[in-house]
């Protein structure tokens, strides 16, 4: 039977200390879970994307179950798709994890030039996101909204394949998309800050389409860097202090460019398992880093494999001067054995203490 050491801080105290660049007792646990949280409390995957109350309680109760940092977030799935008129497919099959794009709103070059920033109070899932944020505020949690990634959202508007073709053949169209997305994200930020104030905000930039499996570093530099940097800078101008950024997938070649984007004081930067945490530490010495146990191993591996990957992450992450969260390299897959996830928390008990 596992015997855990007595914590000297609550999860809330631990998060506050890290955000204020203070010492903590041990590494905090920060699993990213959407569909997995639904499975933990007996909800369907669709429930946690279409019902903000169910999404909130699934995440909060899963957080309580595993003893994780007090931050839960909600983006409605495929964020940017429905807000601009794209059609989506719900995760109704056994192995689907999240909402996927069915038909992009932008089908032609003419559609790009007609595109306008939607009303952030009424478009798509934004009313549900606002309801979720009001629950965050009610329960004293950090308040979240979407702050990127630029190309991920543009891909939900135009389709990733079409967007990638245009990067080569019609780059002005992609720049137009990125401009619209940037203005959209800033408008969301202004609405959220006007509603709640900036003090408890930790918005989220989620960037899977920016991965080098899809685009080159040169394309990242042209189409993502200036726009994502602008969004983050405007958020800080509104009084936001911290941004959570998930650098998803294989992005080693993009890291020097991501490092040019301000993340906060400090920011929280999460990495896919393709990025070594020691490399991440070198590029983001002043931010909290997070990661990055391989999600596929969490779902299909043995508890011993998950425990060993967690130990390696802890060994590397604990050396990072600005703080570290142990978490998965991306969303925890919905079919993951709960014991495998708990094993990550056990590894923190065994290897994650600072003194």
List each language-model region with its residue ranges:
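Active-site loop segments of alpha/beta catalytic cores
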Residues: 1-48, 55-57, 69-74, 90-99, ...
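Membrane-interface helix-loop-helix modules in multi-pass inner-membrane proteins
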Residues: 101-113
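Membrane helical hairpin/interfacial module
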Residues: 57-87
């Amino acid at each position: 039977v596992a015997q855990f050491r007595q914590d000297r801080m609550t999860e809330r105290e631990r998060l506050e200390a890290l955000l204020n660049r203070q010492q903590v007792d041990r590494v905090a646990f920060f699993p990213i879970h959407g569909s997995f949280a639904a499975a933990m409390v007996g909800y369907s995957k669709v429930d946690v994307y279409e019902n903000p109350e169910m999404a909130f309680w699934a995440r909060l109760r899963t957080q309580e179950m595993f003893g994780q940092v007090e931050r839960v977030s909600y983006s409605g799935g495929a964020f940017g798709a429905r807000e601009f008129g794209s059609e989506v497919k719900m995760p109704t099959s056994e192995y689907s994890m999240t909402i996927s794009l069915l038909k992009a709103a932008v089908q032609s070059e003419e559609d790009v030039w007609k595109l306008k920033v939607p009303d952030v109070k009424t478009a798509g899932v934004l009313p549900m996101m606002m309801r979720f944020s009001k629950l965050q505020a009610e329960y004293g949690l950090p308040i979240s909204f979407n702050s990127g990634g630029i190309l991920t959202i543009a891909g939900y508007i135009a389709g990733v394949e079409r967007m990638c073709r245009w990067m080569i053949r019609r780059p002005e169209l992609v720049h137009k998309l990125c401009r619209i997305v940037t203005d959209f994200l800033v408008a969301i930020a202004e609405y959220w800050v006007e509603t709640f104030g900036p003090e408890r905000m930790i918005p989220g930039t989620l960037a899977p389409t920016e991965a080098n499996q899809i685009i080159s570093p040169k394309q990242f530099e042209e189409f993502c860097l200036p726009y994502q940097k602008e969004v983050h800078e405007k958020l800080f101008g509104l009084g936001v202090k911290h941004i959570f950024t998930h650098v998803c997938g294989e992005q080693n070649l993009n890291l020097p460019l991501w490092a040019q984007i301000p993340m906060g004081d400090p920011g929280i930067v999460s990495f896919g398992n393709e990025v070594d945490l020691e490399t991440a530490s070198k590029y983001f010495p002043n931010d909290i880093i997070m990661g990055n146990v391989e999600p596929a191993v969490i779902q299909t591996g043995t508890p011993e494999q998950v425990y060993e990957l967690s130990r390696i992450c802890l060994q590397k992450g604990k050396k990072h001067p600005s703080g570290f969260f142990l978490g998965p390299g991306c969303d925890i897959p919905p079919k993951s054995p709960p014991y495998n996830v708990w094993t990550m928390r056990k590894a923190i008990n065994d290897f994650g203490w600072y003194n």
